[in-house]
Amino acid sequence: MTRREILLGGASITLASCAPSTRIGRATPPKPFTLTDFTLVRDGLDAPEGIASSPDGRLFISNGGGAIGVLERDGTLRQIGKALAPNGVAVDREGRVIVANMGLLNKGPGPLQRIDVATGTVETLVSELEGRQLVASNGPATARNGDIYCTHSSWGPIGNIGTTTPAGFIYRVAPDGRASIVARALRGVNGLCLDREERFVYASLTAEGRIRRWRRQADGSLIDPQDYGPQLGVVIADHQAKDIRAMPVADRAELGYCDGIAFDAAGNLWVTLPFANRIVAITPDGRKVDIVHDPEDRMLSSPTNLCWGGADLRDLYVVSRASGVVVKARTDIAGLPLANWPAA
């Protein structure tokens, strides 16, 4: 039996036990892409990871050149501040950029920062919680009432993609600046987003290859965790990044290690699978839909995060970390307007 047959066999066993957890109405699934649908937006980026958009046409891209990179409408990339370990990116209702720092990447701190792109001011929102310095802030998300949520993936080591240690958590920064942990005991928690009504917070659990959501309370706390949709592919206990990268490309295509997530306006949750070079979506009725796969690294080489932009929110931007580029495609369904955009 080949390695691929073993992986696929494991997938069939695992996926059969994961029925869709949510049925919330008739689904309008997104149309799949071909690689020719993508065009290059920016290349030459140093380890880009997160991305967010502004109604004025600018993009905010985390990369090694600064605390945040601002891609202006004329194509100029303006770096602000000093890079720590910039990772996930969001924008608050006032247009300030929220950057999570994955300190484990360079054995440094992993705080959550807020950046005023007009003045260049960089401030630290959270550097420690419950007496412990943060080292793995990963994916932030903002709500229209001023709440900020962020994932903290683990305490290390960084290379254990399939970690079986549930040491990750989600923390919240209230509008008054107070920070607290609102969800615990998560395996490799990563990307984060809210739905249209901001009733639920959704997170990708990389090590489990699935999405989980929590009901959001009036005080910002999170309750009632539920797995959302099917498992997204093969996952292996304590799977190491170096071993994943050594796998044949065809075998990596089946991996379900999920990263960035974002909703479109029809309620489809788009998910990047960086090790598989794949983007999928979970429909409102709980089905997984394949959007695009790039087995040869032509346009998508470790796609980590995505966002919508453009005047009609139909420009989908995807960060391709391994190749240091951002690419764009037009979608048939617009993206969900986030906290810094006018509500639809």
Predicted feature descriptions by range:
Residues D43-D56, A83-P109, L129-I148, S154, ...:
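Beta-rich, blade/repeat-based domains predominating
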Residues E5-T22:
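N-terminal export signals
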Residues E72-G75, D116-G120, A174-G177, Q217-D219, ...:
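Short loop/turn segments that connect beta-strands within beta-propeller blades
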